[in-house]
């Protein structure tokens, strides 16, 4: 007998989306924040991360249930003279903001350290700033099929651990 290659939506059980910030950033999904350099993408997302680390409401009053850890992975700025001062200025609890040390091997989107760290830290938000810096060497950002493949692993991680993945892309 031939294996069935389709399914009807009537057999699917619907589920509710859980939100970090409704209707902008869902848990278990990827969110992409895109813009030109200098438009405030990092400032904006660090403010959101800071609120999450302290369990504070989002800018429009959307309630967060409690404080959660965050992973902020930035390939362009120094942790001590740029990133931590920005986190402090945003009001983050820096004991709840982690980053993956990539001294021996550059971190890429297909690196198992991402999933391991998200699980170990218990992060509800993973921020990769900017996307281009975490592409695998053969990652062609102009190929839709290649980008789907690369981001697919990150989407699976976000869904499996019910975290939100926020990705920055420079125009």
Could you tell me what each predicted segment is?
Residues 1-4:
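Charged, amphipathic alpha-helical linker segments immediately N-terminal to NTP-binding catalytic cores
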Residues 6-9, 15-16, 20-22, 26, ...:
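Conserved inter-motif catalytic segment of the P-loop NTP-binding fold
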Residues 30:
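Walker A (P-loop) ATP-phosphate-binding motif of ABC ATPase nucleotide-binding domains
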Residues 44, 48:
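Hydrophobic positions on the alpha1 helix immediately C-terminal to the Walker A/P-loop
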Residues 53:
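Gly/Ala-rich phosphate-binding loop of Rossmann-like dinucleotide-binding domains
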Residues 73, 127-128, 162-170:
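Structural recognition of the conserved hydrophobic beta-strand(s) that form the central parallel beta-sheet
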Residues 159:
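Helix-to-beta-strand junctions that scaffold the AdoMet/dcAdoMet cofactor pocket
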